[in-house]
């Protein structure tokens, strides 16, 4: 990216950033019905490699990590059209390119943003309990959920003089609770 002012290149804001992310995954699942119960368990393994490099500064990072993500669902049929379901899933949300790019960008001369090539992914454990009702032309799903996330990415701002410098950081946990009601009709 070239940034100019009065047809002059601003060297501090000209960047050649290389970002390479590779993910290899293997997934297996098993499901079974027994009476009014049905269930499914799954396991996904992922190997992630992220390389970043900012030309001219030599700044970059190399991250390699192996993760295992279990899932499980248990259904119970109350009647032919009513079910309850409990589920668990572990998830990952990797930082995106713009969060990891280590160069500065700005909207004005008082607010400078910098990426963080050392960001880690966010991991979430998701628990759900649902009631489902099916009919000929649709269904309704009422769900209560709890999601616990670690290494949550937040922007951290430091003020030096009259200039604000913002940078994303892995900063703490997040606990989300909620209720969803979804109706689908044809």
Predicted segments — roles?
Residues 1, 39-43, 70, 84-86, ...:
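Transmembrane beta-strands of outer-membrane beta-barrel proteins
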Residues 33, 44-48, 75, 89-91, ...:
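Outer-membrane beta-barrel pore domains and translocons
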Residues 21-58, 65-71, 80-126, 146-169:
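Surface-exposed extracellular loop regions of Gram-negative outer-membrane beta-barrel proteins
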Residues 34-37, 77-81, 124, 134-138, ...:
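Outer-membrane beta-barrel channels and translocator barrels
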Residues 17, 55-65, 116-120, 170-172:
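Outer-membrane beta-barrel proteins
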Residues 27-29, 71-73, 118, 128-130, ...:
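Outer-membrane beta-barrel architecture
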Residues 10-14, 20-23, 120, 135, ...:
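Outer membrane beta-barrel strand-and-loop segments of large Gram-negative receptors
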